[in-house]
Amino acid sequence: GASGLIAFPRL
């Protein structure tokens, strides 16, 4: 979710 993207913004 968004928290995951914030924790690991590296895509």
From Swiss-Prot:
Keyword set, alphabetical order: Amidation, Neuropeptide, Secreted
Record-annotated disulphide pairs: none
RNA-binding in keyword set: no
Biological process (GO), any one: neuropeptide signaling pathway
UniProt modified residues of type Leucine amide: 11
Pfam families registered for this protein in UniProt: Periviscerokin (PF08259)
Function: Mediates visceral muscle contractile activity (myotropic activity).
Family: Belongs to the periviscerokinin family.
Protein name: Periviscerokinin-2
